[in-house]
Amino acid sequence: MDFDSVLSIASQNQGLSSLPKRYSLKTGPPKKDLKVGGVNSAAVQAFLKKKAVEQKNKEQQDKKAKEDLLAKRVELKSDRKARAMASRTKDNFRGYNGIPVIDQPKKRQSKGSSTEEQQSSTKYEGGDYDDEDNFDYEGTDSESEPSRPVKPQAISRPEYSNRVENKPKKLSAPARPASSSMNFADLLKLAEKKQFEPVELKVVKKTEERLRTAEEIRELEMERRVKKLDKGKDVRSDKNSGQKDSRSQTSSNPQKKHVDRDGKNGRFPRPSEEKHQSSSTSKKPKLQASSERTPTSAKLHGDRSNSGSSGALNSKSAMKNGASFQAKQAPPRPSQGQRPATPSDLTPRKGNVSLTQAKSSISGSCPPGAARPGQGPHKNSAHGRPSNFSTSGPSQKPANPGKLSRPGSNAPPRPGGSGVVRPFTGDPSKQPRPGGNLQSQQFPGSSRASLNGPKRMERGVSGSQINRMSSGPGRSQCTVVSETISTKNITPRPGMVQRPPGPQGPRTVIGPSGHRILVKPSGPALPPITSSYKRKFEDEEEYDSEMDDFIDDEGEDQDEISKHIREIFGYDKNKYKDESDYALKFMESSWKEQQKEEARSLRMAVLEDEEEERRELEEMQRKNAKKRK
């Protein structure tokens, strides 16, 4: 189509639209970006490849540098660790090359060192490094350390597995000559192989110990002491119970001879076990009329015995004797084997005191056969009653024969725990009236040995005496240590339950070998002595359920708190800045002072209540007066 034809068509169409269109606002089709020619894709690929290679080289160099550093570091670290472990386990390290020089495996090692050894052996195989030797390097362990697990050079896999299986063994002993041949690259490969193999590690839990307060330190000391004593008691009682038959028989014979011989001269030996009891028992004696005998219906109290308490065993065999004495018969005595002679026996010891006292009052009138140990029937039918028989006064606190002493010679009896005994002579013709002042043989150092007046021991023998008593029933006589016990000062502890007063204390009966035997009278059975009667130590920080919801204001400002304290109590903290907390811990008031304070505050509270009531009454009166107006 040429230009003329176009013009002619245009002229024809000219009249179709009065307004000719000059410009159009329509956007045309988008233009395609023309490709820039001459770009070589192979060149681009080569460039990218070059960059990747460079980066890889750089990474390898970094890795190598890092590995060198790590190798040096591991070497230093393991050397330090090995030295630390060597000093701890006393292994034979002569200079450190990574392997302890041990020619043959040692004998069984302690548990602690075996766990250390196990940890060190397992960490070689890519295990955890956080054992107790790692404490001073943990700050630097930021990077991953694949080369770490490669401490012992040239140890082959079978040796490794062997060591992991036999964990308690020491590092296996044969000298390894090939240790230097394995280079670092081989070690790295070995480590890479091993790093995914599972290693069983027993985690040793370390309980963090916090600093203790003064009270806690004291408590721990007490507990330790008590545990030691308990251990000692168990060992001693085991030994002694093995020897009890032979010892009791041999010991009671010389004892009898001593008493008989000295009874004629009018002076009486005091075997060593009585020596510290003289003061307490000499206060006890008060002669009783024959009407105040134990009732024949006395209950036997042997069932309370337990194997650990030799006092209880003693009372059990005592009950058999006691029953026959009560019924005034003369059956055969139990053989000596039934009476244990452990050092903790309180009853035999006390028996000797009453035996000598009784003999002193009748001046050897007792038949010598009466004190012979292995004898058959008691040679006592001449008198209506057994010749050595002790009763205790009606007002006396009851004792608990079944649990008279804890095992071990160091156990002091609880208050009310030891029977208070008043010996009298069994021969009715020679028996004095209760009011009479028959002088028992006065022991040197004892506070009051005369048997006159109604003085009675209301508490048991204090524990300090029994602690120092020698063991064994038949020791030779020795000097008496004078030691008086004031019964007035012994007050019950605040938390202690009072023992119910019984009708009468247990009667004591002199056994065939001169040992005293306790017989429980009729009446309600006493509750067993529990640990609440004898607290090992006062600890004021024990758990208290009422303190569960105690408000702890640790978050608050200390100055704010001390300001309130100053307002309430008038105590200014700033005045006492030099006082250490440790010193303040020991400035605690005694129980007596606390009781005084309690009483004072109670009085103040009562006064305040009265004041308040008075105020309320006045207020009511005023209101009533207003209403009336």
Swiss-Prot record:
Magnesium recorded as keyword: no
Region feature (Important for interaction with DNA): 1-522
GO BP of this protein: heterochromatin formation; nucleosome assembly; regulation of DNA-templated transcription; transcription by RNA polymerase I
Recorded GO MF terms: DNA binding; histone binding; histone chaperone activity; RNA polymerase I core binding
Compartments, as annotated in UniProt: Nucleus, Nucleolus
Residues forming coiled coils: 45-72, 203-228, 591-629
GO annotation, cellular component aspect: nucleolus
Function: Histone chaperone that stabilizes pre-existing histone tetramers and regulates replication-independent histone exchange on chromatin. Required for normal chromatin refolding in the coding region of transcribed genes, and for the suppression of spurious transcription. Binds DNA and histones and promotes nucleosome assembly (in vitro). Facilitates formation of tetrameric histone complexes containing histone H3 and H4. Modulates RNA polymerase 1-mediated transcription. Binds DNA, with a preference for branched DNA species, such as Y-form DNA and Holliday junction DNA.
Record-stated family: Belongs to the SPT2 family.
PANTHER family: PROTEIN SPT2 HOMOLOG (PTHR22691:SF8), YEAST SPT2-RELATED (PTHR22691)
Protein's name according to its UniProt entry: Protein SPT2 homolog
Organism from which the protein derives: Danio rerio (Zebrafish)
